[in-house]
Amino acid sequence: MALAFGLSACAIHPASDPSAFAARTSQNSFELFGAAVDPPETLLLPLVHDPQEDGAACGAHALASLINYWHGAGTVRGADIFAASPPADTVIGYSMAELLALADASGLLASAVRIPAAGVIGELEAGRPVLVPVKVPSVYVQSRQLPGMNVPVLGLPAEIVTSRTAWLSEKTNWSMLNHFVLVAGYEGDKFVVLEPVAGFRTISAQRFERYRAPFGDAAIVFSRK
């Protein structure tokens, strides 16, 4: 994750909660086209983004959003989890086993499973966000973006560059990063994920499947003890 946090350009403006995301669903996505969802028609759980501050801390921040979902807003910060219980490997970040232990210590029932997209949808419909490991192009999870990314008209060329860079990363397996995201909702053939760097983002089911494939559809499902 360190590579992604070393890039520089204009600051990103994350969609930190469902209402902020609803105002501009097409502007925060892994997709170049067809990114928008219609929030009144979208199943979207009321999670709140806990912004990632360290390159190895995505698991801690994703877990913080989950804990705050189950136990109440402001219960914990990912930065505090990371400071108190850093991953054994501070370059790669948290393992699923470490996150399971942290979830248990935080009063959540957590189980590691292999679950296809249909199963993820079932969890969402039961009101349970799902934590999944993904392998993504680093350009998609950097904390800074290309100039003009958030400006109408100027944003499209920057997004095209980002999309092309991501495509090359996938094809060459260069600058691909292991990352954790929370699946927070879905609509049709798109999922909404809460990504620790940029907040709520849409992603096509096809892309989501590709990014999950290196981990064999692994996931962690949660409920309150």
Task: Give a label for each model feature.
Residues M1-S8:
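Bacterial N-terminal signal peptides
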Residues T75-V76, P129, V192:
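Secondary-structure boundary/capping residues
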Residues L102-Q142:
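...with weaker cross-activation on analogous glycine-rich loops/strands in unrelated enzymes
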Residues C10-M96, A117, V136, R144, ...:
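Active-site-adjacent structural segments surrounding the nucleophilic cysteine of cysteine proteases
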Residues S65-A73, A84, A88, L102-L109, ...:
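Structured segments of extracytoplasmic/periplasmic soluble domains
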Residues A11-P18, R24-G34, E125, Y140, ...:
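Noncatalytic regulatory segments and standalone regulatory/sensor domains
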Residues S8, A110-S111, A219:
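Generic structural motif
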